[in-house]
Amino acid sequence: MKILFATTNPAKIKRYADKLREKNIEVLTIKDLGINIKPEETGKNAIENAYIKAKAYYDETKITTIGMDNNLYIEELPEEKQPGTHVRRVNGKELNDDGMIKYYCNLVKEYGGKLTAKWVYGMVIYDGKESKEYSWSKSNFYLVDKPCERRNSGYPLDSMSIMPECNKYFVDLTEDDRNKNIENYKEDDVIKFVVNNL
């Protein structure tokens, strides 16, 4: 079976494509199909933006499509400074990975150098008739103003996010770290959601 993943983010593709391939699901990408549309993400939360992406790419290709979006919430920030659905878009400008690290390091520094944050994820599978939704979150982690040197292309904040349970940057987590902190690593549940809804 083939499914389109409506993202250009190489880290998201890598994170899920290998595990889905093990379940005999081939993940096609926007790049694979040479699609050059960019739906406007006007949703109020991760599920709404995931639906917008999934429907737009399904309408373009007629291939069952996965849309995914992330929201970032930072406990110590006032509402007007919350990234929410606009993690990459700051003041109307889309930031690249380096721009995100610079912006968020400065923001964290402004509020004391260490902030408590949480990712909330939304995934939608759309097949032209109906949509299936799944939402999950990672437990709280810390954003710090001193990023490590290593980078995870497509997930730049992994270089400045620390898992409190093991005091490691996300970019340095091993599979063993993730398995020990199972609450923080829910990808198997996401894979089950995809497999069960195709």
Show which residues each predicted segment covers.
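Anionic-ligand binding patches
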Residues: 2-4, 11-18, 23-198
